[in-house]
């Protein structure tokens, strides 16, 4: 009789816990190389289109780091995924005060938008595909 009661109790617990486990959101893995076209408007350079390459090299839970590849070299950044597991932000290591606001569109696609205010204002966005 005790075994039947124990089984019923365990089934009852599973009945209440299992639905929560199904709906728990998994933190997306952003590690990899991302590439795509960047479109931007700049006070100094006007409207510009260019290729954008981002490599995310490390991730622990929702925080990550990596670099953007420019013509002049690599620029390091650090970032964080918001608790909704869809939106993220990063700050680069340059002396400007620009920031990136991003959205995870799916496992293979992210959108990043860069904003920098001031005398040399820049606003631009990229749709980046994971290439490796």
Identify the residue ranges that each predicted region occupies.
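Residue-level signal for glycine
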Residues: 28, 73-75, 120
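N-terminal Sec-dependent export signals
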Residues: 5, 24-26, 66
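N-terminal helix-cap/turn-to-beta initiation motif at the start of protein domains
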Residues: 21-35, 58-59, 131-132
